[in-house]
Amino acid sequence: MTSSSKDMKAGSVLQSSGEERRRGPLDQLPPPANSNKPLTPFSIEDILNKPSVKKSVGSLCPPRVLEKVTGSSASRNGISAPSSPLCALEELASKTFKGLEVSVIQAAEGREHINAFGQRQASKKRRKSRTAFTNHQIYELEKRFLYQKYLSPADRDQIAQQLGLTNAQVITWFQNRRAKLKRDLEEMKADVESLKKIPPQALQKLVSMEDMEDAHGGSGPISPSLSPRAFPQSPSSSRGQTTDEFSEEDEEIEVDD
């Protein structure tokens, strides 16, 4: 009996040792602290039996990035957090784009200043001094313009040498004089068209009034429609005028002395 009981005990010991060898390493681990949480053999936290740690935003981004997001200065409070590659890349990109934006704005402002300066210089170049002709020069030019509206190169040289002017000044004066004559003709045509629209009775009345004024010695007032100012002056009557009167339209040209 004793030998058989010993054999049974030895067999049970061997059986228990065999069962222990057949058990895996996971079966030998102590139970978790939280019994309500199910075991997951493939989880590192369950194997090491450590509670999960929630990472804060400060562990992912540096204090300067947190200041932009939350508006609080972590560096002033003495809080330092490790920076991640993603946050470092974001910070570098923001600095790069900020520098590019500043450079683009400065370049645009520089171009605006250059353009404004160029416009001022161009406007100054357009303004040219007018040539002051003497009465004798204007008289000779008007006399020549009566029978010759366009000058040949030889005539232009002759007049310039005779009056002590340059070829450019002679060309400019004749161009301005032709422009003035064109305006006078257009005004005369407009006056004629306006007179055509007046009824014959009104014209007859105006003529009779003019005859009465002539009979009384012309002491009465002159009708505005028959005033000499209503009609353009002849080219010969413009003697003694200055060149400013010949340069009223954009088509007239100015030259330097």
Curated annotation (Swiss-Prot):
Swiss-Prot/TrEMBL GO biological process terms: embryonic axis specification; muscle cell development; muscle cell differentiation; positive regulation of convergent extension involved in gastrulation; positive regulation of non-canonical Wnt signaling pathway; posterior lateral line neuromast deposition; posterior lateral line neuromast primordium migration; regulation of canonical Wnt signaling pathway
Secretion signal, residue range per the UniProt entry: none
Subcellular localization, as worded in the UniProt entry: Nucleus
An annotated GO cellular component: nucleus
Compositional bias of kind Polar residues: 233-243
Membrane-spanning segments: none
Listed CDD domains: homeodomain (cd00086)
Disrupted gene: phenotype observed: Morpholino knockdown results in circling swimming behavior at the larval stage. Reduced fin bud formation and loss of myod1 expression in embryo hyoid muscles. Disruption of cuboidal morphology of adaxial cell pseudo-epithelium, and failure of myod1-expressing cells to incorporate into the adaxial cell layer. Slow muscle fibers are abnormally shaped at 24 hpf and 48 hpf and fast muscle cells form shorter myofibrils at 24 hpf and 48 hpf, in addition unfused fast muscles cells are present at 48 hpf.
Region of interest (Disordered), ranges: 1-43, 206-257
Domain of life where this protein originates: Eukaryota
Keywords: Developmental protein, DNA-binding, Homeobox, Nucleus
InterPro entries found in the cross-reference section: HD, Homeobox_CS, Homeodomain-like_sf, HTH_motif, LBX_TF
Single annotated GO MF: DNA-binding transcription factor activity, RNA polymerase II-specific
Function, in words: Transcription factor required in several developmental processes. Involved in axis formation during embryonic development by inhibiting tle3a/gro2 from binding to tcf7l1a, thereby facilitating ctnnb1-mediated transcription of canonical Wnt/CTNNB1 signaling target genes. Regulates convergent extension movements and hypaxial myogenesis during gastrulation by activating non-canonical Wnt signaling via wnt5b. Required for the formation of myofibrils and fusion of fast muscle precursor cells, potentially via transcriptional regulation of genes specific to thick and thin myofilaments.
PANTHER family (UniProt xref): TRANSCRIPTION FACTOR LBX (PTHR24336), TRANSCRIPTION FACTOR LBX2 (PTHR24336:SF12)
Protein name: Transcription factor LBX2
Naturally occurring in which organism (per UniProt): Danio rerio (Zebrafish)
Highest classification ranks of the organism: Eukaryota, Metazoa, Chordata, Craniata, Vertebrata
